[in-house]
Amino acid sequence: MDLWLREGQIEDAAMTYKIKETLVTKKTKYQELAIVDTYALGRMLVLDGIVQTTVKDEYVYHEMITHIPLFTHPNPQKVLIVGGGDGGTVREVLKHETVEKVVLCEIDEQVVYECKKYLPEISCELDNPKCEVFIGDGIKYVHQHRNEFDVIIVDSTDPFGAAEGLFGGSFYKEIYNCLTEDGIFIAQTETPFYLPEVVKQVYKDAKEIFPITRLFMAGIPTYPSGFWSFTIGSKKYDPKEVDLSSTLNINTKYYTKELHKACFVLPKFVEDLTR
């Protein structure tokens, strides 16, 4: 008998994945957690029934949410990641030699624990001496730190439940204060196909706070519609105008210097959401 995972992506649409093996399922303090091995996409982290990352395509998301801001900032030394307990963003951040410290603030310690156990390709840098794993509320952490981080990456789940407070103007104001005087913030901001109102509102909220606000897209097969948005807010540096003439000094599978520029070219219906 075949076993399938059905992910309800929106009210009227779903994706299904054929499961080879269920590695772990548990109810944590905050959510239902599962890691399964699938035939099509390899091992997969699922939270509250929603696919968060897979071994097959995780590099797209983690490279784009990391390298766009870190190559935009001329000297990123201290980085904060809110969420991202799987460790993929930490892995990509630590490819940058300028980074002296990265703080991962994850509310659910079980995500970190199980990903270290079952997703070593993604979580491989969580024990790096440059990485501090802080288990706690990202909103409170940001509020308690001022003028400290060069880059803040909000690597959150969808804007529901525990992650709902990570979307919106009040949190972005706290992020602004947590950043250094030339700091950069980035967040994953859902799909413009299914959730255009979320994309539009997040961009509007960020633009009211940051002098430079940009939206860019990436193709991520696992995520609803496969067409995903990221919003970046910067105090000083424009990611569209950054000088990338020097040789790329890190190994990537998706991000390139050319793509850094190209990803900001938006389809008209997405561009309209930024107006």
From Swiss-Prot:
Keyword set, alphabetical order: Cytoplasm, Polyamine biosynthesis, Spermidine biosynthesis, Transferase
SUPFAM superfamilies recorded: S-adenosyl-L-methionine-dependent methyltransferases (SSF53335)
Compartments where located: Cytoplasm
Binding residues for spermidine: H62, D86, D155, S156, T157, D158
Keyword Transferase included in the entry's annotation: yes
Annotated metabolic or biological route of this protein: Amine and polyamine biosynthesis; spermidine biosynthesis; spermidine from putrescine: step 1/1
Pfam families cross-referenced by the UniProt entry: Spermine_synt_N, Spermine_synth
Amino-acid positions noted as binding S-methyl-5'-thioadenosine in the UniProt annotation, renumbered to this chain: Q31, E106, D137, G138
Similarity comment: Belongs to the spermidine/spermine synthase family.
The protein's assembly and partners: Homodimer or homotetramer.
Protein name: Polyamine aminopropyltransferase
